[in-house]
């Protein structure tokens, strides 16, 4: 009994941290809350806005710099906002906040970002110096803005589908509504 033989049949070793495919940081990251199309669109928004920002940062000189600076601000903001929304959707933070508010915020942020990014790309087209970095930034900017607007249209379509499912069918007869009450 001095060697602890009494406790050996019932004592189990501590298994330690979980090992497997969903351990560590991957356990907190879940992409399944978004449908496949929306996941692809969010990823493209993130990538294209980052590429537009990087290409714009490569520009070393400009003649009319207002369009360049506005495009820089918008492309960086679009990247950060799309990253923020993606983090909210893919982490446990999504369950801690009201999901309708997350979806509503995503809806309006995506619309606003798409419109402002399109405007910034149009302004940058009219003020650029025709260097290859500027042209690449403009192309990525236009494609990114279209991805934001396509994501907005997808969300709008999903909202309409949800409202159609929630709307009860009108089962009352039209002729019953026109009959007099005292007849």
Curated annotation (Swiss-Prot):
This is CKLF-like MARVEL transmembrane domain-containing protein 6. Master regulator of recycling and plasma membrane expression of PD-L1/CD274, an immune inhibitory ligand critical for immune tolerance to self and antitumor immunity. Associates with both constitutive and IFNG-induced PD-L1/CD274 at recycling endosomes, where it protects PD-L1/CD274 from being targeted for lysosomal degradation, likely by preventing its STUB1-mediated ubiquitination. May stabilize PD-L1/CD274 expression on antigen presenting cells and potentiates inhibitory signaling by PDCD1/CD279, its receptor on T-cells, ultimately triggering T-cell anergy. Belongs to the chemokine-like factor family. The keyword Hydrolase does not apply. The modification N-acetylmethionine is found at residue 1. Keywords: Acetylation, Cell membrane, Endosome, Membrane, Phosphoprotein, Transmembrane, Transmembrane helix, Transport. The chain crosses the membrane at residues 40-60, 68-88, 107-127, 135-155. InterPro entries: Marvel, MARVEL-CKLF_proteins. It is found in: Cell membrane; Early endosome membrane; Recycling endosome membrane. GO terms for cellular component: azurophil granule membrane; early endosome membrane; membrane; plasma membrane; recycling endosome membrane; specific granule membrane. It holds the Pfam family MARVEL. It is a multi-pass membrane protein. Its main location: membrane. Expressed in the leukocytes, placenta and testis. Residues 61-67, 128-134 are extracellular. The modification Phosphoserine is found at residue 8. Residues 33-160 form the MARVEL domain. One of its GO terms (biological process) is endocytic recycling.
